[in-house]
């Protein structure tokens, strides 16, 4: 999972991820937007579920984050569309709408994101 942190002309932090993990970047850009308190909340929840059978979920406007003891899933809320609504033979391109990664890798990304924001 490759990624980079950037700043646009206004100083807003943007995150780009490699193919297969793009949704994590979209989630950070759309749902977190540099909110360190939200990062604190997610990291605390990760510490609670780590090594357990428990799960935790954070619903956002566009994306939902799920954590369990080993894995993280970021999923676009638009994927809640029922299969009945699809025309026969059609399926969704969801590579940029769904991502799974390990909890430790995800926490490293959040730490890098936090460090980049603080390092203005």
From Swiss-Prot:
Q: Write one Pfam family the protein is assigned to.
A: UPF0231
Q: Which family does it belong to?
A: Belongs to the UPF0231 family.
Return the protein name: UPF0231 protein YE0706
Species whose genome carries this gene: Yersinia enterocolitica serotype O:8 / biotype 1B (strain NCTC 13174 / 8081)
The organism's taxonomy opens as: Bacteria, Pseudomonadati, Pseudomonadota, Gammaproteobacteria, Enterobacterales
């Amino acid at each position: 999972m490759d990624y980079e942190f950037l700043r646009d002309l206004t100083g807003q932090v943007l995150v780009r991820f490699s193919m297969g993990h793009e949704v994590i970047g979209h989630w950070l850009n759309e749902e977190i937007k540099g909110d360190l308190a939200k990062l604190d909340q997610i990291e605390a929840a990760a510490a609670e579920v780590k090594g357990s059978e428990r799960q935790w979920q954070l619903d956002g406007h566009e994306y939902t984050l799920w954590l369990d003891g080993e894995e993280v899933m970021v999923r676009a809320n638009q994927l809640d569309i029922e299969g009945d609504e699809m025309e026969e033979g059609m399926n969704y391109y969801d590579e940029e709408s769904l991502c799974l990664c390990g909890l430790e890798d995800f926490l490293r990304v959040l730490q890098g994101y936090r460090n980049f924001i603080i390092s203005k």
